[in-house]
Design a protein with these regions (language model features):
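Conserved N-terminal entry element of GNAT/NAT acetyltransferase domains
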Residues: 2-39
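Short amphipathic alpha-helix that is part of the acyltransferase structural core
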Residues: 25-70, 80-100
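Conserved GNAT acetyl-CoA-binding A-motif
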Residues: 171-183
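Conserved acetyl-CoA-binding loop-helix of GNAT-fold acetyltransferases
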Residues: 151-168
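Conserved beta-strand-loop-alpha-helix junction that forms the acyl-donor binding cleft
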Residues: 142, 181-189
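A conserved mid-domain beta-alpha-beta active-site/ligand-binding segment of alpha/beta enzyme cores
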Residues: 211-245
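Single conserved hydrophobic/aromatic residue that forms the stacking wall/gate
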Residues: 246, 251-256
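Conserved acyl-donor/pantetheine-binding loop and adjacent beta-alpha core of acyl/acetyltransferases
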Residues: 97-150, 194-219
Length: 256
């Protein structure tokens, strides 16, 4: 496990966050949304990589390298980085990386070159009918010091600010209809809560057309009969309440 790099000098960050890279102001907390790449903002990219590694290591993940930056961040047609910037604190508060379907390249076998290509098989229907109108999202993070409500309104609204930015993408490009990406659940996550979330999503949002299937199917210790008893309702709203009840920060024990 290598040491994480020191924070990038704020003057270098501000020099790269120029007017043409600004997407919009946030609805709350008076922050700014910027879109950058590793090529046009190398110092910002280093700070993004540092913040990712800090946040992901804290929860049991991370790359183990000084920064979390991979080939998809740095390749010729690199993924773009959407970040929340605090003009007041002069800090990056959070971010996503993304690639619009219209910008996706394909390999010699016709397989889309995506950060998730090693995880998923994509059907022809998805590639032809869905992907061109889709934004692939990944590497989402909130800077560790802004993940607690103790950081005040800025911390409370960082996720809201990020969603402002994601929503703005479809305003800039009205052809975008879908958002797609993977969700990471670390081994440290409560397994019972994880199983409930997975069951709930499968119950109400099944992929009947098999648009995307996992290369390595997820194996769980899920007790399906128990899950059925925990989610007895035939509608989303009531089952969602059950899911929240058991998977909130201080969840009830489903065994009781």
């Amino acid at each position: 496990m290598q040491d994480i790099i020191n924070p990038i000098d704020r003057a270098l960050l501000k020099a790269e966050l120029t007017k043409e890279k600004r997407l919009r102001s946030t609805n709350k907390s008076k922050n700014e949304i910027y879109i950058v790449t590793a090529h046009d903002s190398p110092n910002v990219m280093q700070e993004i990589g540092r913040l990712r590694e800090v946040a992901f290591r804290y929860y049991g993940g991370g790359t183990g390298f000084p920064v979390d930056i991979d080939e998809y961040d740095t390749m010729e047609d690199a993924y773009r980085q959407l970040i929340v910037w605090s003009p007041e604190d002069e800090q990056i508060l959070g971010g996503y990386r993304f690639l619009c379907g219209s910008d996706v390249k394909f390999d010699e076998n016709g397989k889309p070159i995506l950060a998730t290509s090693h995880l998923f098989n994509f059907s022809e229907k998805f590639i032809k009918e869905i992907l061109p109108y889709t934004v692939e999202l990944g590497r989402s993070f909130v800077a560790l010091e802004y993940q607690s409500t103790r950081s005040g309104a800025k911390g409370l609204f960082v996720l809201d600010n990020l969603w402002d930015g994601l929503g703005a993408l479809s305003v800039v490009d009205p052809s975008l209809r879908y958002y797609f990406g993977k969700v990471t659940m670390y081994n440290t996550y409560n397994q019972e809560a994880r199983n409930m979330i997975l069951y709930f999503l499968g119950l109400h949002f099944p992929d009947a057309d098999q648009l995307i299937t996992p290369v390595y199917p997820l194996e769980t210790n899920m007790d399906v009969e128990k899950m059925r008893s925990l989610f007895p309702h035939d509608n989303f709203k009531d089952n969602y309440k059950v899911c929240l009840l058991y998977t909130s920060p201080s969840p009830r024990d489903p065994k009781t």
